[in-house]
């Protein structure tokens, strides 16, 4: 992913609300599965890490990206954004 594409995705993600929260139990298999399923409806997902989670948000973001086969767009504070294009009909068209 180029920096131009990443910047474009960041601009789209700025208006998104987090649809998942990582809490004190950190990454459970159920949460990872739910995030993976959310990519069936969304290509861009924002996730929040709650204050009671002791793990580093950057590490959590990397782990979720690996497990869901998505790309990490950005980590800001305790929120991160993931992108996974739809295989059949991509909704978001990235700049070249």
Stretch-by-stretch model annotation:
Residues 1-96:
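Positively charged, polar, low-complexity stretches
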């Amino acid at each position: 992913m180029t920096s131009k594409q990443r910047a474009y995705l960041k601009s789209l993600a700025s208006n998104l609300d987090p649809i998942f929260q990582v809490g004190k139990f950190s990454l459970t298999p159920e949460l990872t599965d739910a995030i993976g399923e959310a990519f069936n409806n969304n290509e861009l997902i924002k996730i929040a890490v709650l204050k009671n989670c002791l793990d580093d948000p950057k590490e959590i973001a990397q782990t979720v990206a690996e497990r869901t086969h998505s790309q990490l767009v950005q980590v800001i504070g305790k929120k991160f954004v993931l992108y996974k294009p739809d295989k059949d009909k991509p909704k978001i068209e990235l700049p070249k």
